[in-house]
Amino acid sequence: MGYFESPAGHVVRTINEAWAFVPDPLPPTLTWTVGLINDLSAADRVLGELAGLGRNLVNPNLLIRPFMRREAVLSSRIEGTQATLTDLYVYEGEQLSLFEPPPDVQEVHNYVQALEYGLNRLQEFPLSLRLIREIHAHLMEGVRGEEMTPGEFRRRQNCIGPPGCSLGEATYVPPPVPHMHEALDAFERFLYDDAGLPPLVRLGLIHYQFEAIHPFLDGNGRIGRLLLTLLLCAWELLPEPLLYLSAYFEAHRRAYYEHLLAVSQEGAWEQWLRFFLRGVVEQSRDAMVRARRLQDLREGYREQLQVEQTGARLLQVVDLLFDQPLVTVTQVSEVLNVHFASANHYVQQLEEAGILREITGQARNRVYRADEVLAAIEGGGRG
């Protein structure tokens, strides 16, 4: 395995005489090179800009819910799901009789549910092992891997590697169960102790450590990435959950796993932290571009649709599209609490304005998509 001389931990025997890696408790001894300091400074600066944007949002939900769903799609995609953002909106809008999204879309939906649950619970309780288990139960409810004890830490050895590989063939073997519990106790203590370290460095260390402990039989990667968002909010680095790193990890998937593995094998903390901090910079900038694009789109629609009598209701439909870019007339009727005929009139107005497009080609049970909104949420963030 190459872990025998690692400065980041030690190896122990596990079942079938295989070797497993046990990471040392955090924090490690870090070497503060010029490169690491510069990357940290850049990440702090750009994250501060994103926080400023978040504090000045007139309607935070305009961004929070779309960003959350995009993150759910991308974080789940790293684990092999095929569901798209459109699939997720179809699933959430209960338009399943019209479209057949892939079966793994529930996994993506569960990610949204787990993240929302965690953010709500953090308003009452600090992040803890107990809360992490609760979030995992929401993540794994009713999906593949449900037999993998949702909401419970593993009671048997697991490993990371090709499907069906033995422990001896695995790329990485996490701590055996007794060592896992010791590592988790130390992990929880570090959550409450800043150790005099900058918050973003702590965040990078915590993400590695959770991946190294791998305390669940399934869902570890998604929980590890979800924790980043929760801690950014819990530590008040951001006023709203606006920064997500899964797009960066997905775009650099091979480097992501290589850096994590290199910490375990070689103690390559600096390389991992610099990779992580560059992700904070890249995704903070992406979030600001995407946020401004969505805000500009909303303001453009509002200017386009300002009319005397129906203006207020019509603008409510516009705001609905940023939360649910695929809608039916029935949904509009229910959300606005208006008659079907009135909702149909509003939808037709938006279709005539080029804001909505009917996508089924049917005379009944029609579905309308806000193409520009969807493109702004899921498209490239640069520009």
PLM-predicted stretches and their roles:
Residues 1-383:
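FIC/Doc superfamily catalytic core
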